[in-house]
UniProtKB/Swiss-Prot annotation:
NCBIfam families, alphabetized: alaS
Species whose genome carries this gene: Delftia acidovorans (strain DSM 14801 / SPH-1)
Compartments (UniProt record): Cytoplasm
Gene designation per UniProt: alaS
Family membership noted in the UniProt record: Belongs to the class-II aminoacyl-tRNA synthetase family.
Protein name as annotated: Alanine--tRNA ligase
UniProt GO molecular function: alanine-tRNA ligase activity; aminoacyl-tRNA deacylase activity; ATP binding; tRNA binding; zinc ion binding
Length: 874
């Protein structure tokens, strides 16, 4: 039977249509950044968006689902990056076809529908297909052999082959405990002419038998002892790689030969000017443009940490392969339009964000190209000596100075049959961290040794608390007593003081007894559940065991709470106004203001800032109550609360609802949104590539800021003698008048230069056939000096000229040499001869140079020496 040819677009559509006809709801691909699991770096399978359903913490309005999911495997446990470009089937980014049953159908329907789609829709030859089942899964085996009719010799039982009970290629587990079950994989046989054996055989890693579809049957719940019991509602989770299936249906062996990749490879060849489209580096570039573009679309900007660093590694790997092909200027970002052409219909978000994606990649590309050549020279020099291992310190220098991720250096070395001393690299990295720690001013809490009990935190409910001193520290060491005037750290058994965490600064206040007063200047965590109160004992003495009263500075706490609460509301507004790609990159919340760093690739416009302010202040006016609930992490995920990637959350978390915002947060907050009072953005700017910063104030500080602006406006209006309502018009008129006067001044200076040129020309002295002139011009600026110089050179013919102007102690110099004389005299040398005597230096072209100086007293002698200086050189 002849297998028809399907394009990638055909496969996506036919897959979804098939399962829709079987009662499945078509579900849109979720982002590459998982929204329900901050511990997972990237979405790496189709089931990620349904994880909460499988865990029983979420329900959907459907029991059958199908989707085409974008996936990424380039970081953490699931990392295919180093293999991309070297094999036929490894990718960073790929698409996963899948169908799911949530307590509805089970093995029979799943396997029969898979067989129907493959053999009747895609027309794959039945004799080319075989399946594996878990050795103990007789039900799946019987469905394959007795109901579908697959010959027993083409249904392979796979047992526990990974060193333990239920440890098998054909037994799937979500985690060490919880939902699990057997799976059945479908393989395609490329034929005996291709090397490799069937699954389960010693030669199974060959290319003959290729897995195309995995059907996972979640029918058990595993406990901590490894025992399983049946789930009340078994589920089905299947996944089939789109690129692998396309290669089979398009009658090619490598995924890179399918229509989608061929279009991208040809585009990469166009931009790198390479004729041979079989070049492996083109495959790398074609793969990486998919990964990087979709990452940007989902809010991941190149950076030096977390997901952003994985993005940076992929971008720079693609650029390095282009450089290897001879491309010395930015090219990678130009492929975005080609990607949109082949994938924009299936994923409209990349078409909608095409300009933004292109710009993000362009900025990153230009940044790396600035250092790439120098880095490659160092790498080439290090490898030229014939050593088989690149020293770790060299790899670290490439990383630290030239922005070479370690895997990029590994990539280059592997191409040359060499390896990298990764242990040496890590040693160099650790040494740098130690130096940074030693050079920095670290707070005392980092070095304190505390072995006592955790303290109770009562600061959500109270601002004052009776407590007992359980530990004291002075100069980093434990002591039994602090005396008046000593700085130290106090640890209490219970405290209302909030310790610095999550961007919120620590509380200030007072710890006191009848005879002692300790001023708390900051509160920091010694351990996760032990707070250190840093400050100075202003009077009396304080001993371990003393009963004390701990009181938080209520005004500072209230102001800090306003700023922290508004940060949550602002974060929500930023995502609504700028887009879902906005992700928090850092924050600082204190009593003065809130500072919020977020992923966004361009300045926030004045109109956008006004809309953000409008939305936030609307939430404040609504005066809705704040609600904080403590729950387990899985329940929190089910509520849709925003979580930050990289944050370590415990089993129990605090979910904060404030306005329309819902986030995990352990900070202190206002009781109602109206307590914030007023919100005003006071600053916006860039802090790194793809990261913007907004600063804002609230409450009394916002009012003070607006009153200050009003005062400035009033002063400007008074100076211009205009009502504030007419200020813009009056300023516009004044600017027009200034521009007109500037034109008049420029014209007068031009006339002055012309007249001075006529007068000065007569002062030139002939030195061996060259007219030499050194003179001072009164009231001239740099432009007047240059204009006068040009007129003098025209008048004098062969000439060497120095002109000077003085403003206070500052000297401006211009030197000019007619072109015919530049072989003997350089204007730069001439101007520096004079500049060196007036405390300055300069430079320029052989026929014109400028300089400045700071010692006008040396100018007369310097100008007087010009004639002799020229005479020595002609």
């Amino acid at each position: 039977m002849s297998t028809p040819t399907f394009t990638v677009a055909d496969i996506r559509k036919s897959f979804l249509d098939f399962f829709a006809s079987k009662g499945h709801t078509i579900v849109e691909s979720s982002p590459l950044v998982p929204g329900n699991d901050p511990t997972l770096m990237f979405t790496n399978s189709g089931m990620v968006q349904f994880k909460d359903v499988f865990l029983g913490t979420d329900k959907r309005p459907y029991k059958r689902a199908t989707s085409v999911q974008t996936c990424l495997r380039a970081g953490g446990k699931h990392n295919d990056l180093e293999n991309v470009g070297y094999t036929a089937r490894h990718h960073t980014f790929f698409e996963m076809l899948g169908n799911w049953s949530f307590g509805d159908y089970f093995k029979r329907e799943s396997l029969k529908w898979a067989w129907e789609l493959l053999t009747e829709v895609y027309k794959l030859p039945k004799e080319r297909l075989l399946a594996t089942v878990y050795a103990e899964d007789d039900e799946a085996y019987d469905i394959w052999t007795k109901e579908i009719g697959l010959p027993p010799e083409r249904v392979i039982r796979i047992g526990d082959n990974k060193g333990g009970r239920y440890k098998s290629d054909n037994f799937w587990m979500m985690a060490d405990t919880g939902p699990c079950g057997p799976c059945s994989e479908i393989f395609y046989d490329h034929g005996a002419h291709v090397a490799g054996g069937p699954p389960g055989s010693p030669d199974e890693d060959g290319d003959r038998f290729i897995e195309i579809w995995n059907n996972v049957f979640m029918q058990f719940d595993m406990d901590e002892q490894g025992n399983v019991k049946p789930l009340p509602a078994p589920c089905v989770d299947t996944g089939m790689g789109l690129e692998r299936l396309a290669a089979i249906l398009q009658h090619v062996h490598s995924n890179y030969e399918i229509d989608l990749f061929q279009a991208l490879i040809k585009a990469a060849a166009r931009e790198t000017h390479i004729a041979d489209i079989e070049t492996p580096s083109l495959k790398v570039i074609a793969d990486h443009i998919r990964a990087t573009a979709f990452l940007v679309a989902d809010g991941v900007i190149p950076s030096n940490e977390g997901r952003g660093y994985v993005q940076r590694r992929i971008v720079r790997r693609a650029i390095r392969h282009g450089y290897k092909l001879g491309q010395k200027t930015p090219f990678f970002h130009k492929l975005v339009k080609d990607l949109v052409a082949v994938m924009g219909d299936a994923y409209p978000k990349i078409r909608e964000q095409e300009a933004r994606i292109t710009e993000v990649l362009r900025v990153e590309e230009e940044r790396f190209f600035e250092t790439l050549a120098n880095g490659m020279e160092i790498l080439d020099a290090a490898l030229a000596g014939g050593a088989k291992v690149l020293p770790g310190d060299v790899a670290f220098k490439l990383h630290d100075t030239y922005g070479f991720p370690l895997d990029l250096t590994n990539d280059v070395c592997r191409e040359r049959g060499l390896s990298v001393d990764e242990a040496g690299f890590q040693t160099a990295m650790e040494e740098q961290k130690n130096k940074a720690r030693a050079a920095g001013k670290f707070k005392m809490d980092r070095a304190l040794e505390y072995t006592g009990d955790a303290n109770a935190f009562t600061g959500y409910q109270k601002l004052a608390e009776a407590a007992k001193v359980v530990a004291l520290y002075a100069e980093g060491s434990a002591v039994q007593e602090l005396k008046a005037g000593q700085s130290g750290v106090v640890v209490l058994d219970t405290t209302p003081f909030y310790a610095e965490s999550g961007g919120q600064v620590g509380d200030q206040g007072v710890i006191s007894t009848a005879g002692a007063r300790f001023a708390v200047e900051d509160t920091l965590k010694i351990k996760a559940d032990v707070f250190g109160h840093h400050g100075v004992l202003e009077s009396g003495s304080l001993k371990v065991g003393d009963a004390v009263q701990a009181e938080v500075d209520t005004q500072l706490r209230a102001a800090t709470m306003r700023n922290h609460s508004v940060t949550h509301i602002m974060h929500k507004a930023l995502r609504e106004v700028l887009g879902d790609h906005v992700q928090q990159k850092g924050s600082l919340v204190n009593a003065e203001r809130t500072r919020f760093d977020f992923a966004h690739n361009q300045p926030v416009t004045a109109e956008e800032i006004r809309e953000i302010e409008r939305r936030v202040n609307a939430e404040i006016l609504a005066n809705t109550p704040t609600d904080a609930r403590v729950m387990d992490i899985e329940s929190a995920k089910a509520t849709g609360a925003m979580m930050l990637f990289g944050e370590k959350y415990g089993d129990s978390v605090r979910v904060l609802d404030i306005g329309s915002s819902r986030e995990l947060c352990g900070g202190t907050h206002v009781q109602r949104t109206g307590d914030i009072g007023l919100f005003k953005v006071v600053g916006e700017g860039g802090v790194a590539a793809g990261v913007r910063r907004i600063e804002a104030v609230t409450g009394e500080n916002a009012l003070a800021y607006l009153q200050s602006l009003e005062s400035t406006v009033d002063q400007a209006a008074a100076a211009l003698k205009a009502p504030t309502a007419e200020l813009n018009t009056r300023i516009g008129g004044a600017l027009e008048q200034i521009r007109a006067l500037e034109k008049e001044v420029a014209a007068l200076k031009g006339k002055l230069a012309s007249s001075q040129g006529d007068e000065l020309a007569g002062q030139a002295v002939d030195v061996k056939g060259i007219k030499v002139l050194a003179a001072r011009l009164e009231g001239a600026d740099a432009k007047t000096l240059r204009d006068t110089m040009d007129k003098l050179k025209d008048k004098l013919g062969a000439a060497a000229i120095v002109l000077a102007a003085v403003d206070g102690d500052k000297v401006q110099l211009a030197a000019g040499v007619t072109k015919a004389e530049t072989s003997r005299i350089k204007a730069g040398d001439l101007v520096n001869f004079v500049a060196s005597q007036v405390g300055g230096k300069g430079g320029g072209k052989p026929d014109m140079a400028m300089a400045g100086g700071t010692d006008a007293s040396g100018l007369p002698a310097a100008l007087a020496g010009v004639h002799a200086w020229v005479a020595e050189r002609v």
